[in-house]
């Protein structure tokens, strides 16, 4: 498949093409043509001329539709009644092109950055270099910087997602194609081992074509654990230590007396295997598997790197001196063949002790073991100390260049990954905690009916119980299946902490947290597992409790809950035991589903302001954990801009955020891309912490008042459609593939928390994913246009004055600018023409006209309001990279959407052919891959 000739064809919709930079993008379009041609040849060779011609017809017609805004009827006719045996290769062809186009776009970004640097241009925003320049200009006080960055941490938390399920073979093949295209972009025609690059690309594309993209069976949690861990070998083991060392060195050079960043600033986390909110498949065994596999991944990496260091550090004692400490370390390796190689002997001692550590804490044996009969390391700090001994000896005797290579990365890696690799959060719904704790209290004879108590009596009872050391139940207690399971999970977490260290399970997140008793109930469960002891003068609390505020109402009440928690002396003592630090998690997904994009965004902002004020008054350090999804409808959008859009004091040196779905692969599958994205997170965290980025000054309160009013209007407009329109749920179920997301083999977790068709009980991921697949993208924009239109018309000022107020906020306020920028991205990716095809799946014509009519009207209204407030005709005027992507890549989504509609129609009509189901699943994954942030 080659790129269609553009000629004089015009773009579709509000995303307008510009000739500016066309010359600069020619290399990317050439890469797309190359990969498309190779894929087209592969389709022809493997599936025959007839399938190839069908793919080509669909491709050409799709470009005509996208570029000329012609009617889509021909595409719909092309796929109506298509033989399923032809439909599958067509779906696979366009899905593979989406994957290959992603590669070309990523390579182009690398190319543009290299050109930018080579030209000597100023560093780009979101880079660490640009951030350092801003910090230098600010002339910050050393003591202020030290206090602001005390305990600083930036933690991307990997979570499972139903459409990010690519098999390892596909993952590795895509990585190989990326490496080959990188060589091609650099002007090479052969690989380092003499292979022809184009021929090797053909081999890899053929491998990709002949490999199943998806699994035949429903994804298991063990599969999701493996998917999450693969990013360490792919990028994290190299990039995270590099970023940590670079940031620490740069900041200490600027403020040498401040002793900054004793601990690594970037520390990854995970939810995969610990998040049991609505997922009955997460058990104690799964927690043990997740933490054990993570520890295995870390130690296996260290052993492999130590083996490589042994091969590289071959210095002879006859030629190079060593420190006494290095000589003493080497003494424990008595191998005569290496008597003259002190560094190799020292490294073998380290490898021998780490082998003993692996034997003690792992359930399976990694490669590169070396059994010297030495004692294991008790802690990662002991391992680090031995590596530091090797480093110090190298530096003391003229070998700093060697110390700064593989050994430096390994030392930094041990600092951040320890024996645990990444912190696994526990998460459960507050309703489950309540049910289990009520049972435990009844069994122990403390109270027969805890759930009947009012809130103040619950808090009093739970606080008293936390103040005692005795557990409520013993191992022989006869409990319900639910209580047994919940206690088993927290006991498995306690086991992981004992085995791998306290960083193995650092946080316990409470979903739907609405009261102080919700927090204390979780504390009771942790106490039962020995993870909380508040009875003595020095409380023990290795696991932090993080209330998750998810709905609009909960966000409004969050500060009051935090204040009441911290007013309890016993809980305050637990916070003190954790360095006077308390984490609160903010839920973007459910608040959006509850109240719409704008109301949710503003509720989160207001909640942050209030939480920061409570923390300031009480004197604790607040860390906010942002539960962001890949899409704008779930809090997504560019991370750098999102962090800078936080209110004053909300970042405070520390930030955790979830990374989900296709976003994980887009950000972290390749080392170069991963480094850029991690640097962007750190850069924004430093700027938001150390600089005044809000920019509102004395005008903050009037600005907040405007958003208070607009958010109410937006929530009302959203609720009128989603919660109050008769038949809306029926429309949603029929016009999107949400039912199929639940019934086909997608993800390990049910689509709803409860077995109902209620929007409230539906999980946020299928809610957003379904609207993304049908190209409505409703959660990312609906209600916003009406809100702005009504606010402009309702005020005491003139319409022009009200527009000027909004335009001024857009110009000066990063938060408001981010809201409108993310809104534009969603609108640009939406396509109401395609959405109309999905609407035809709704049998009730009156319902279809009523609901889709409202959606189409609001879509037009929102685009018009965006143009009015920003002054930009083009939705993506400030995002040329996405504009290029929409223009060059989105035509290839057309056939996937049309085929999905066709196959959904067949499946719902009773066609139970397994290939029809597989085709639907393939279209879902293809669209998710192409959109790169579909859920």
From Swiss-Prot:
UniProt catalytic activity: oxaloacetate + phosphate = phosphoenolpyruvate + hydrogencarbonate
UniProt KW keywords: Carbon dioxide fixation, Lyase, Magnesium
One Gene Ontology biological process: carbon fixation
GO terms, molecular function: magnesium ion binding; phosphoenolpyruvate carboxylase activity
EC number: 4.1.1.31
Keyword Magnesium attributed: yes
Entries under Pfam families matching the protein: PEPcase
Top-level class of the enzyme under EC nomenclature: lyase
Superkingdom assignment: Bacteria
Co-factor requirement: Mg(2+)
Active-site residue numbers: 161, 593
Lyase as UniProt keyword: yes
Gene Ontology, cellular component aspect: cytosol
Function per UniProt: Forms oxaloacetate, a four-carbon dicarboxylic acid source for the tricarboxylic acid cycle.
Similarity-based family: Belongs to the PEPCase type 1 family.
Record's protein name: Phosphoenolpyruvate carboxylase
Species this chain originates from: Mycolicibacterium paratuberculosis (strain ATCC BAA-968 / K-10)
Name of the gene encoding the protein in the UniProt record: ppc
């Amino acid at each position: 498949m080659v790129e269609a000739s553009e000629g004089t064809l015009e773009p579709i919709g509000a995303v307008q093409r510009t000739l500016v930079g066309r010359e600069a993008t020619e290399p990317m379009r050439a890469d797309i043509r190359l990969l498309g041609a190779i894929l087209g040849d592969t389709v022809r060779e493997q599936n025959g001329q007839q399938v190839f011609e069908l793919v080509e017809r669909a491709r050409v017609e799709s470009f005509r539709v996208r570029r000329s805004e012609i009617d889509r009827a021909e595409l719909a006719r092309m796929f109506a009644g298509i033989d399923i045996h032809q439909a599958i290769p067509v779906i696979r062809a366009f899905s593979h092109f989406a994957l290959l186009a992603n590669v070309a776009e990523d390579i182009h970004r690398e190319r543009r950055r290299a050109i930018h640097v080579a030209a000597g241009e100023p560093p780009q925003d979101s880079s660490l270099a640009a951030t350092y320049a801003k910090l230098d200009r600010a002339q910050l006080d050393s003591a202020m910087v030290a206090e602001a960055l005390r305990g600083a941490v930036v933690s991307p938390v990997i979570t499972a997602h139903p459409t990010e399920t690519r098999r390892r073979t596909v993952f590795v093949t895509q990585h190989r194609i990326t490496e080959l295209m990188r060589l091609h972009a650099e002007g090479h025609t052969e690989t380092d081992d003499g292979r022809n690059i184009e021929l090797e690309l053909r081999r890899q594309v053929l491998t990709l074509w002949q490999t199943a993209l998806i699994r035949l069976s429903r994804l298991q949690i063990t599969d999701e654990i493996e998917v999450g861990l693969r990013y360490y070998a792919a990028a994290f083991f190299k990039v995270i230590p590099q970023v940590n060392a670079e940031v620490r060195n740069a900041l200490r050079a600027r403020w040498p007396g401040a002793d900054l960043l004793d601990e690594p600033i970037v520390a990854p986390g995970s939810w995969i295997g610990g998040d049991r909110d609505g997922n009955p498949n997460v058990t104690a065994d799964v927690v043990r598997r997740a933490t054990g596999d993570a520890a295995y991944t870390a130690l296996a990496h260290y052993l492999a790197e130590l083996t490589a260091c042994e091969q590289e550090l071959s210095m002879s004692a006859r030629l190079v001196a060593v420190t006494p400490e290095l000589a003493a370390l080497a003494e424990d390796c008595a191998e005569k063949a290496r008597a003259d190689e002190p560094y190799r002997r020292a490294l073998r001692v380290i490898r021998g002790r780490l082998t003993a550590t692996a034997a003690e804490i792992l359930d399976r044996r990694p490669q590169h073991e070396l059994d010297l009969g030495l004692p294991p390391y008790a802690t990662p700090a002991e391992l680090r100390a031995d590596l530091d001994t090797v480093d110090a000896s190298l530096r003391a005797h003229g070998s700093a260049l060697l110390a700064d290579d593989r050994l430096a990365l390994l030392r930094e890696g041990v600092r951040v990954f320890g024996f645990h690799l990444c912190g696994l959060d526990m998460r459960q719904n507050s309703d489950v905690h309540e049910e289990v704790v009520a049972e435990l209290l009844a069994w122990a004879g403390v109270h027969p009916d805890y759930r009947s108590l009012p809130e103040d009596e619950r808090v009093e009872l739970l606080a008293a119980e936390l103040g005692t050391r005795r557990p409520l139940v013993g191992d022989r207690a006869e409990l319900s299946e639910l209580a047994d399971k919940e206690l088993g999970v927290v006991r498995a977490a306690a086991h992981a902490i004992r085995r791998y260290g306290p960083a193995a399970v650092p946080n316990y997140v409470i979903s739907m947290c609405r009261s102080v008793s919700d927090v204390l109930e979780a504390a009771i469960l942790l106490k039962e597992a020995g993870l909380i002891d508040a009875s003595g003068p020095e409380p023990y609390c290795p696991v932090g409790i993080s209330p998750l505020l998810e709905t609009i109402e909960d966000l409004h009440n969050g500060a009051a809950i935090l204040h009441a928690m911290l007013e309890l002396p016993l809980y305050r003592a637990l916070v003190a035991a954790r360095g006077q630090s308390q984490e609160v998690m903010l839920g973007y997904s459910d608040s959006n589903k509850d109240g719409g994009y704008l109301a949710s965004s503003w509720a989160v902002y207001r909640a942050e302001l209030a939480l920061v004020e409570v923390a300031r008054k009480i004197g604790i350090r607040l860390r906010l954990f942002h539960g962001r999804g890949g899409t704008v409808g779930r809090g997504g959008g560019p991370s750098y801009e999102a962090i800078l859009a936080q209110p004053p004091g909300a970042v405070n040196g520390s930030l955790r955020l979830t990374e989900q779905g296709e976003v994980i692969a887009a950000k972290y599958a390749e080392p170069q891309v991963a480094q850029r994205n991690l640097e962007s997170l750190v850069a924004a965290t430093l700027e938001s912490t150390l600089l005044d980025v809000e920019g509102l000054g004395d005008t903050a309160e009037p600005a907040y008042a405007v958003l208070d009013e607009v958010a109410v209007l937006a929530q009302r407009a959203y609720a009128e459609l989603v919660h109050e329109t008769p038949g809306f749920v029926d429309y949603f179920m029929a016009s999107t593939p949400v039912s199929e997301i639940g019934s086909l083999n997608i993800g390990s977790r049910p689509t709803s928390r409860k077995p109902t068709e209620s929007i409230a009980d539906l999980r946020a991921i299928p809610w957003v994913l379904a609207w993304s697949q049908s190209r409505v993208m409703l959660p990312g924009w609906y209600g916003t246009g009406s809100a702005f239109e009504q606010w402009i018309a309702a005020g005491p000022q003139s319409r022009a004055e009200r527009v000027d107020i909004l335009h001024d906020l857009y110009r000066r306020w990063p938060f408001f600018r981010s809201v409108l920028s993310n809104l534009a991205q969603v609108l640009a990716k939406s396509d109401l023409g395609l959405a109309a095809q999905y609407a035809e799946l709704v049998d009730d014509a009156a319902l279809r006209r009523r609901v889709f009519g409202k959606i189409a009207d609001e879509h037009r209204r929102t685009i018009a309001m965006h143009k009015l407030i920003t002054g930009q005709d083009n939705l993506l005027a400030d995002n040329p990279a996405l504009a290029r992507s929409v223009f060059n890549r989105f035509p290839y989504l057309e056939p996937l959407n049309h085929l999905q509609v066709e196959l959904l129609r067949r499946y719902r009509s009773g066609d139970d052919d397994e290939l029809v189901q597989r085709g639907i699943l393939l279209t879902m994954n293809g669209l998710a891959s192409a959109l790169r942030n579909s859920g």
